[in-house]
C-alpha cells in the first residue's frame, strides 16, 4: 500500500501545532525505516495514527516480543474517526500476535516520548476511551547554558575527558554490556560521524565507568554536534560518587566551547531531575506513556 505521506504530514502539523514535522521526517523515521514495520493505512477521514511493530531486529534489544507502538496520532474534526482507525489497527496488531500496544517512542524512531496531556488533552481522552492506561510520566528538560558551572571536588583515580580514538571500541562494549540498544546505536553513529568533543568518558583506574554525549538529535545528520543532550549514564556500582557530575560538567563545557546556545533532552524521570537542576536545567514539558492490553 502506498500512502500519501504529504497528507499525513499535513494532518500531523495541523494537530501537533507545536511539534511540526517534515515529509522527510516521516519517511526516514517511520515509512522507510528498516527497524519499523508500519500498519497501513495510517490515516483515514480526518484522523491519523502512526502504528507499527518492530521491523528488522534492533541490535541486541530483546524485550520486544508481543509489543507494538503508536508513535503519533491525532484528528482534525471527529474524535470518532481516530477511534475507528485505531480499532482497525488493533485488529492488525492482533494478527501480528502483538498483545500490548504502547503510545510511546519506538527506538530508534523518535518523535515525542508520549502524550503531552497539557498541550494535547484531547488525544489522551481519546486513548483512554480506547482502553489505554497511563503507565509512566516522563520529563523533558532544557538549559540555556548560561548558568555558571558548579565546582566539584576531584575524585582520586578518576579521569574524565573527551573520548580517545583508542578507546572507542571499548566504549561501545561498555555501553553494550550496561545500557539499552538505543544508547549503543546513538553512540556508534556519533563515534563514527561526529567529533570527539561530543562524547565524554569517565575512567576509574583506566577502566570506563561512565559516559555522556550530545548531538543534533534529528535531521539527516542527527549525529552531528547539536543541542540534544544525552544519553548519559554511569555504571550502577559507581553511582552516587560524583562521577555523573563530572561527566555533566565536561559535556556542558564542550557544548559552550562549540558555541551551542542551549541543551535539551526529552526523557528522564522525577528521581533523576535533581542532578540536572544543579546544572541549570529546568523542566520544559511532561509526557505520559500509555499502554493498551489487547490479550
What are these regions (language model features)?
Residues 61-64, 68-82, 107, 231-240:
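A short, internal acetyl-CoA/4′-phosphopantetheine-binding micro-motif in the GNAT/acyltransferase core
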Residues 48-55, 131, 136-139, 210, ...:
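A structural microfeature
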Residues 78-156, 290-292:
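Acyl-donor-binding surface of acyltransferase catalytic domains
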Amino acid at each position: 500500500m502506498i500512502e500519501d505521506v504529504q497528507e499525513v504530514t499535513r494532518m500531523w502539523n495541523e494537530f501537533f501545532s507545536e511539534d511540526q514535522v517534515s515529509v522527510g521526517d516521516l519517511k526516514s523515521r517511520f515509512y522507510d525505516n528498516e527497524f519499523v514495520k508500519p500498519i497501513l493505512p495510517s490515516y483515514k477521514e480526518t484522523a491519523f495514527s502512526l502504528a507499527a511493530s518492530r521491523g528488522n531486529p534492533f541490535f541486541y534489544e530483546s524485550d520486544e516480543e508481543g509489543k507494538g507502538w503508536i508513535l503519533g496520532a491525532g484528528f482534525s474534526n471527529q474524535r470518532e474517526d481516530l477511534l475507528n482507525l485505531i480499532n482497525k489497527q488493533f485488529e492488525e496488531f492482533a494478527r501480528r500476535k502483538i498483545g500490548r500496544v504502547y503510545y510511546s517512542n519506538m527506538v530508534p524512531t523518535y518523535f515525542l516520548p508520549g502524550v503531552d496531556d497539557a498541550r494535547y488533552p484531547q488525544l489522551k481522552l481519546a486513548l483512554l476511551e480506547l482502553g489505554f492506561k497511563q503507565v509512566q510520566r516522563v520529563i523533558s528538560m532544557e538549559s540555556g547554558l548560561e548558568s555558571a558551572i558548579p565546582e566539584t571536588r576531584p575524585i582520586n583515580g578518576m579521569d574524565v575527558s573527551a573520548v580517545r580514538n583508542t578507546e572507542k571500541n571499548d566504549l561501545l562494549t561498555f555501553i553494550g554490556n550496561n545500557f539499552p540498544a538505543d544508547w549503543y546505536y546513538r553512540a556508534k553513529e556519533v563515534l563514527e560521524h561526529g567529533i570527539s568533543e561530543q562524547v565524554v568518558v569517565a575512567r576509574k583506574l583506566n577502566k570506563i565507568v561512565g559516559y555522556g554525549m550530545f548531538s543534533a538529535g534529528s535531521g539527516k545528520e542527527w549525529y552531528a554536534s547539536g543541542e540534544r543532550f544525552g544519553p548519559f549514564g554511569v555504571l550502577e556500582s559507581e553511582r552516587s560518587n560524583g562521577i555523573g557530575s563530572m561527566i555533566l560538567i565536561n559535556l556542558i563545557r564542550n557544548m559552550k566551547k562549540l558555541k551551542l546556545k542551549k541543551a535539551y533532552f526529552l526523557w528522564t524521570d522525577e528521581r533523576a531531575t535533581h542532578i540536572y537542576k544543579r546544572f541549570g536545567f529546568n523542566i520544559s514539558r511532561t509526557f505520559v506513556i500509555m499502554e493498551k492490553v489487547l490479550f
